[in-house]
Amino acid sequence: MKIAVVAANGRAGKLIVKEAVERGHDVTAFVRGENQTAAEKAVQKDIMDLTSEDLASFDVVIDAFGAWTPETLGGHVATSQHLCDALSGTDVRLLIVGGAGSLFVNPEHTQRVMDGPDFPEAFVPLATAQGEELEKLRSRNDVAWTFVSPAADFQADGERTGAYILGGEELTLNEAGESVISYADYAIAMVDEIESGDHIRQRISVVRK
C-alpha cells in the first residue's frame, strides 16, 4: 500500500514509518526538516501547506502530529482538519495518532479519563486539545478517518512486545489491570489497522496485552 506519514520525524511517526517499511509498504515521509525516518521517499513540507494533489496518490495518510506547549496545542485540531479538507470526498483513509484522555471510563460514555480526580493537571490541556480534535472528526462524514487512542501510559521507550488488545471508546485494562502501551507496539497496531481497513469513522484504542 502507498502510505503517507505526516509529521514523520516525531517519535511516534518514526516508529510507524519503520513498521510500515519493514512490512513492505511504499512509505513517504512528510517532514519539515531533514528526513530522519526509515522511508526512502520524503517530502519537506509543512502540514498546513499540504494540498489534495500532494495526497491524492496515497491509499492511507497517517497524521502523527504532536504538540505539547500551550501555544501549539491548537495544532491538533488545525492539522487534522486541514488534512480532512485535503482528503474530503476521496477514498484515501486518514488515521490519526490520538490521545487517551478522551477515552470513556463508564458504559454511558459520560465520564472520560481526563475528568477523573487523579488525572495529572499538567496533561489536561493536551487531553482537552486531543478531545476537541476527536469531536471535530466525528462530524466529518466526508472523510474515511480513524482516531487511534493509545493506552493511558504511552511509553516512548517501552518494549516492543508485538501483543496488544484492540479496544474502542472505553479505557481498556489488560489482565494485569494496566493501561499501558509502548510507542513500538502502538506502531504495530497502527499498521495492522492500515492493512485491515476496518473502523472507518471510528475511534479505536490499544493497550499492551
Question: Can you annotate each of these PLM segments?
Answer:
Residues 29-36, 152:
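Short, polar loop motifs at secondary-structure junctions
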Residues 34-90:
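NAD(P)H-binding glycine-rich loop region in Rossmannoid oxidoreductase-like domains
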Residues 145, 196-208:
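Core catalytic loop region at the nicotinamide-binding pocket of NAD(P)H-dependent oxidoreductases
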